[in-house]
From Swiss-Prot:
GO terms for cellular component: extracellular region
Protein name: Conotoxin Lt11.3
Signal peptide: 1-26
S-S bonds: C27-C41, C34-C46, C40-C50, C45-C54
Short name of any one Pfam family annotated for the protein: Conotoxin_I2
Annotated propeptide span(s): 61-71
Tissue expression per record: Expressed by the venom duct.
Family membership noted in the UniProt record: Belongs to the conotoxin I2 superfamily.
UniProt-annotated location(s): Secreted
Primary residence: secreted
Residues modified as Proline amide: P57
Length: 71
């Protein structure tokens, strides 16, 4: 009886530990919203969206975007 109680308690402890590890490693995938770099799996939060790397458009891209919005 004592062995059964100990093994059941051990199994429940392992299940609780695995659930805790699953909750603490949760991170946001690429393309989803974020509030800081630590929320993202790849640790890059650009403009409140998880990205593989931040893209900073150059002058030419900004100018083309400006003319598209004027039409």
């Amino acid at each position: 009886m004592m062995f059964r109680l100990t093994s059941v308690g051990c199994i429940l402890l392992v299940i609780a530990f695995l659930n805790l590890v699953g909750l603490t490693n949760a991170c946001t995938s690429e393309g989803y919203s974020c509030s800081s770099d630590s929320n993202c799996c790849k640790n890059v939060c650009c403009w409140n969206v998880c990205e593989s790397h931040c893209r900073h458009p150059g002058k030419r891209t900004r100018l083309q975007g400006f003319f598209k919005h004027r039409r």
